[in-house]
Amino acid sequence: MASPDDPLRSDHMAKEPVEDTDPSTLSFAMSDKYPIQDTGLPKAKECDTVNSNCPPNSDDQPQGEENDFPDSTKDPLSGVSRNQPCKDRKGSCSCPSCSPRAPTISDLLNDQDLLDTIRIKLDPCHPTVKNWRNFASKWGMPYDELCFLEQRPQSPTLEFLFRNSQRTVGQLMELCRLYHRADVEKILRRWVDEEWPHRGHSDSSMHF
């Protein structure tokens, strides 16, 4: 075994390359091959140059002017009058201004002749014929209230109609069909078809 002072061993070690582990020399050598990128923030002048060359952000545009449409918050129908009377004087127009609204029971209360006819039809009590009690019970009137109205001298049918004046005549006609009172439905149908169009038009003309 060769000793540390062996001249052959010393000669062999002199021929082998020695690795340089000095970090300072390594960093200089790597910087020559791979330049270090500057990741710092751009200078003020560079920022001004970049901003001047960049197009404006689309998000900064006024929202009302996107796609070349003018900014407007007005009602598109503001220039159109919704309550303009119809100019057709022939009576054949079917526009909303000329068409009468759906009649309510409160409209029936203005026709005394019609009320008298309905009262005569619905006031009497018959064992097999439905009357005002069935109508009122169907629309939610309690039993005690039914008995109370029946004892009063006034017509219970008229009282029933007064308490349901906001309902439509169409709903009242449905009750007539439900309880097979075709005689009352026929009276109401004739009034809706013949009398109400004139009354409805006169009521509409009062608004103009």
Swiss-Prot record:
GO biological process, alphabetically ordered: canonical NF-kappaB signal transduction; cell differentiation; hair follicle development; odontogenesis of dentin-containing tooth; trachea gland development
Positions with biased composition (Polar residues): 49-61
Localization per record: Cytoplasm
SUPFAM superfamilies from the UniProt entry: DEATH domain (SSF47986)
GO MF annotations, alphabetized: death receptor binding
Cellular component per GO, a single term: cytoplasm
Keyword list, A-Z: Cytoplasm, Developmental protein, Differentiation
Segments traversing the membrane: none
Location of the region described as Disordered in the Swiss-Prot/TrEMBL record: 1-99
Domain called Death: residue spans: 116-195
Subunit structure comment from the entry: Binds EDAR. Self-associates and binds TRAF1, TRAF2 and TRAF3.
Function comment: Adapter protein that interacts with EDAR DEATH domain and couples the receptor to EDA signaling pathway during morphogenesis of ectodermal organs. Mediates the activation of NF-kappa-B.
Descriptive protein name: Ectodysplasin-A receptor-associated adapter protein
Organism: Mus musculus (Mouse)
Gene that this polypeptide is encoded by: Edaradd
